[in-house]
């Protein structure tokens, strides 16, 4: 599985071949420079110091200085280009993950935690960057150094090199033993970190509720519990890594000590020169540190590999493909029809939300919808938007089955305004044009005037170009709703869905805005879910939704006479 993951990573890296060639040349230059220093040391001792040959000493020192300069320049290019490749590659990975994630079905987002998504697109991606740098830079460099060092050790002394080689299989034992534990702990650590991100996101999205209920202490305790769980996984993983590293270093340096001991004996016997043993020890140290570096990287690789796997699952998820048979010109008179529609949420399989619902809505109609909470009012709109797909029955627009069309084509006809206005960080204007970036200034100015935005925007320093903070934190609830409605109207939809979209406005402001909306939407369809009966009294007809079906329909006056459910809703509001 790890090999497959690395192969997927390499597929991203192949786009940066020129940079990688520079990295490889730099790596080889660094390795060659370090290895050549060993032979210079041998020459320095055997031909310079041992024979008191000052010219040979000077030449050796000059060569070492030259090699250090080459080493420094090559290290600069290696570091710059490998990190450059890593940044470009992870940005592409992040883009691919984000681009695929944003095409998920709405139901799939309900199974994901926002914090987990954020963690994957930030922390996990950073781990992949570390993997690229470590694998392509340090792992390959250490491998070249290890192979070069061992080869030159054999060139200096076959006997001593054989002693060093024996230590490599010994090092593999703890690597294999600890590797499985580290891999499992790495996955748990990432999952635990995602829970922390989710908790942070949830906390600061609901900070007012936490303050209002004086719940700061409980939230701190809850966060600390999650933090301790994450810390436990990290500490255990770090202990295993540290233990492995300590064992590796002990084995490597015991081998080097043994080499020095045997080498010193060979010098005394005249089998080796002092220069040979010094260069051998130099190569042994290089090989030892390189092998130690490799084993440490291998012990660390499980965390970034787990992160890569979590990202690849997002990238590899195949989005649902949709046919696009439905063709509807905006000039056609719009109509909507539900025929015996049933629907149940996957998260609540035992609760039928829409139950054999049938209704028809023609163009140039303002339709009000009322009903008790959980009756299926909002679900009706979300089915029309293709956020979900009905279990049975048919939903038609202009007598065309919407399931035969790409949801994006359906949504071009519709503008949707939920009760909780979706406001993005930026300006008032950027939020208004979110649904129609090609809108003219005249259209924008007309809409902000109609929706009453002009009045409060004029009091701001930069008008509609004023920054409104994250999620519109600097705006009131009513101002947010006006912006959301303006965004919907600027889209020039055939169908306008209002889900308690003016609940934050007072009754007079709501009626004034509603009249403006009806004027703009002449010849089209307005469907408005209302909590206040006064919001829909002027509707052409009202649908009373109860237990997932249409319990009654008609004008306000008709329903007041003929529908017990509607009368009860009106009576409850009057009582309140």
UniProtKB/Swiss-Prot annotation:
A cellular component term, taken from the record's GO annotations: plasma membrane
Segments passing through the bilayer: 21-41, 61-81, 135-155, 158-178, 242-262, 277-297
UniProt GO MF annotations: ABC-type oligopeptide transporter activity; ATP binding; ATP hydrolysis activity
Places the protein is found: Cell inner membrane
UniProt domain ABC transmembrane type-1: residue ranges: 20-303
Residue ranges of domain ABC transporter in the record: 336-572
A Pfam family matched in the record: ABC_tran
EC number(s) recorded for this UniProt protein: 7.-.-.-
Membrane topology listed for this record: Multi-pass membrane protein
Binding site residues for ATP: 371-378
Role of this protein: Part of an ABC transporter complex. Transmembrane domains (TMD) form a pore in the inner membrane and the ATP-binding domain (NBD) is responsible for energy generation.
Oligomer status and interactors: Homodimer.
Domain notes: The ATP-binding domain (NBD) and the transmembrane domain (TMD) are fused.
Protein family according to the UniProt entry: Belongs to the ABC transporter superfamily.
Protein name stated in the entry: Putative export ATP-binding/permease protein RF_0214
Source organism per UniProt: Rickettsia felis (strain ATCC VR-1525 / URRWXCal2) (Rickettsia azadi)
Lineage: Bacteria, Pseudomonadati, Pseudomonadota, Alphaproteobacteria, Rickettsiales
